[in-house]
Amino acid sequence: MNCGPAFSISQSTFYIGVSSGNFTAGYLVAVNATTLAPILPHVHLIDPNTGQNATIPDDSSAAPTVGPDGDVYYGVFETACCSNHDRGWLLHFNSALTASKLPGAFGWDTTASVVAKAIVASYHGGSSYLLLTKYNNYKSTGGNGQNYVAITDPNTPMTDPVTGVSVMNVVMEQIGRTADGPPTGAVREWCINSSAIDPVTKSAIVNSEDGTNYRWDFTTNTLSQQMSLSPGVGEAYTPTVIGPDGTVYAINDAVLYAIGQ
């Protein structure tokens, strides 16, 4: 499988997903960062809609994310296509992996980005931080093709309109800019597995399948800047990164771009 580790707040533990093969069941495992000895218990990854095994595809690049409070988030695929429109689930656990918490409604091939509460002015809830993931709704697997990126509250529930499962509440969302109908309203999907968060400008840098790199401004909830990188092709989900000097790094059509002034 294709998964990187995430370290605990203390750096003494790292978390990683494991499976026995492509599209098989899997576990989230905690490991001693010094000795590499497994730390029990491991978590059996379960689809919150079916109550059965979630699956871990080899072509998913999802990696765990550790929140500032130590909670662990990991994206998985559904038990089988297409009970959640191939969106998967963002599973949510405490740091000891002994308690399952509120899941997110999108987890396929995504690594959640942590968003500081202070940079989302419109948020007045009780969580100390928020999460950003892509929130596509694939038209080829039962969805309406209205593909979003979303900021979610990891502790406040809403009812998922597709499955009826209680999931993380969507605080803010931004639909893709380039039409891709039919059906009417469908847009090109967001091609990211994680997003760079810019606390200085209170924004995120996100890649789209339309070949464009966008800045999503959290204050205005608009795509405030953009840079065309390619004509737009179906491609792998890739991350964006911001360097110490403010340069943005993004991959589009298998080319790494450095974007800056």
Where do the language-model regions lie?
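Extracytoplasmic/lumenal domain signature
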Residues: 1-2, 6-261
